[in-house]
């Protein structure tokens, strides 16, 4: 499925968010490194949740638009009145 301009923009936004949270440096005591990794993991979890919300909101919008289009298409359909079947006598 080719990506549209809106999807590319969302992916660039998500990539930008991930780029701004680099892995912590290997400096400091073991406790400092452990705390830095813990804070980094927490930030990564928040970024993943945010990215998921951003992406799924777009998917939900597309789904709502598709459903609306189906409803409009169905409104144009008309049921034809069929004649009564012949009776066998």
Curated annotation (Swiss-Prot):
Keyword Transport set for record: yes
Function: Escorts unspliced or incompletely spliced viral pre-mRNAs (late transcripts) out of the nucleus of infected cells. These pre-mRNAs carry a recognition sequence called Rev responsive element (RRE) located in the env gene, that is not present in fully spliced viral mRNAs (early transcripts). This function is essential since most viral proteins are translated from unspliced or partially spliced pre-mRNAs which cannot exit the nucleus by the pathway used by fully processed cellular mRNAs.
GO molecular function: DNA-binding transcription factor activity; RNA binding
Short sequence motif named Nuclear localization signal and RNA-binding (RRE), residue ranges: 29-45
Record's GO cellular component terms: host cell cytoplasm; host cell nucleolus
Protein's recorded name: Protein Rev
InterPro entries for the chain: REV_protein
Chain segments carrying region Homomultimerization: 13-21
Subunit structure: Homomultimer; when bound to the RRE. Multimeric assembly is essential for activity.
Keywords, sorted A to Z: Host cytoplasm, Host nucleus, mRNA transport, RNA-binding, Transport
Main location group: host cell
Superkingdom, natural source: Viruses
Cell location: Host nucleus, Host nucleolus; Host cytoplasm
GO biological process: mRNA transport
């Amino acid at each position: 499925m080719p990506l549209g301009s809106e999807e590319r923009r969302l992916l660039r936004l998500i990539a930008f968010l991930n780029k701004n949270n680099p892995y912590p440096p290997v400096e400091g005591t073991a406790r400092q490194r452990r705390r830095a990794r813990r804070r980094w993991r927490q930030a990564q979890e928040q970024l993943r949740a945010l990215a998921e919300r951003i992406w799924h909101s777009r998917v939900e919008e597309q789904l709502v638009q598709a459903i609306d289009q189906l409803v409009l298409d169905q409104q144009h359909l008309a049921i034809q009145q069929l004649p009564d079947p012949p009776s066998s006598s």
